[in-house]
């Protein structure tokens, strides 16, 4: 046993469970690639100020959860707690918004880090797939992203998730609501820290998950009652487009999410099988974020879906993903000449796209066949001195148990035909 263990709140992805995570990532990415989204990858750490400005200085993410550190050169950096700010920074730095058609549509996948109290569904290191559409203010774009996320989940076989939808208004109508909410919050029995948060960003209080706080928020003013005509019309079009696409959703007037940059459309995907950590993903529109981090006005929208929580949701529903075997053919050599010849055949099989593995370590027939069984291979190729003297190998169908002799020079073509 190793002296070292994974740090608290983190995990290692190892086979066979890692295959589930790869399948989830691919299921989320596939409809994005099919809808004009290009892949982007950003560093695992950024300037602290990027997140302080973008995510919000009063958010729990920035004040309590960020892994921040100072380099030997004096730079203040942080492990990325979310993906949107990094992707927008990269797009601005590369001038993608000047290169051609808007919106710039990007998708990404990676690990993110937050210093949180570890529990099921909430880790200090977690995996997400995200999508961002940068540089266009269009209800159809908001609807597109919600529909694509719904499509991703359903392609995995997930059914018992809900989509919560709200509008946070814009810079014209939200200040009026903000003032009304602050007046309401000042009359509640809240602790000093929460009252301070209410003065900086009162919407953060609506996102407080503590039961004693939520009980007092029953009569809080609702943002939908303060939306200006433009925001009402925008939100109604998003709702109509989603409905026309056959995607079900629930209006949630108290949905604000945990990041300060959201404007207008905000949404969350929740699964009741996950207990208190019910959100499996979410996103929204962030029309002012580009300007917050020093860029031009670029209205944008995006989401991030949690790979870890999606896997947990699938398990909660009892969904078994159809995962292809990592090995289709397993070669078992008996003797040095067979070892040389079968190793060459395994290499040929791989070149023509057949997943093949080899019995390494000079194990006997019994031990090698155990490995073949464990590999999940459909076929096993066995060869000994007598077989090679006759110019054949033994091809065994691991499902039926049927075994046939096939010419050494024909085995690759035979397996190609069988695996088709």
Curated annotation (Swiss-Prot):
One of its GO terms (biological process) is histidyl-tRNA aminoacylation. InterPro entries: aa-tRNA-synth_II, aa-tRNA-synth_II/BPL/LPL, Anticodon-bd, Anticodon-bd_dom_sf, His-tRNA-ligase, HisRS-like_core, HisRS/HisZ, HisRS_anticodon. Keywords: Aminoacyl-tRNA synthetase, ATP-binding, Cytoplasm, Ligase, Nucleotide-binding, Protein biosynthesis. One of its GO terms (molecular function) is histidine-tRNA ligase activity. Homodimer. SUPFAM superfamilies: Class II aaRS ABD-related, Class II aaRS and biotin synthetases. This is Histidine--tRNA ligase. The lineage of its organism: Bacteria, Bacillati, Actinomycetota, Actinomycetes, Kitasatosporales. It is an enzyme of class 6 (ligase). Belongs to the class-II aminoacyl-tRNA synthetase family. The gene is hisS. It catalyses: tRNA(His) + L-histidine + ATP = L-histidyl-tRNA(His) + AMP + diphosphate + H(+). Its main location: cytoplasm. The keyword Cell inner membrane does not apply. It comes from Streptomyces avermitilis (strain ATCC 31267 / DSM 46492 / JCM 5070 / NBRC 14893 / NCIMB 12804 / NRRL 8165 / MA-4680). GO terms for cellular component: cytoplasm. Its EC number is 6.1.1.21. Pfam families: HGTP_anticodon (PF03129), tRNA-synt_His (PF13393). It is found in: Cytoplasm. It comes from the Bacteria.
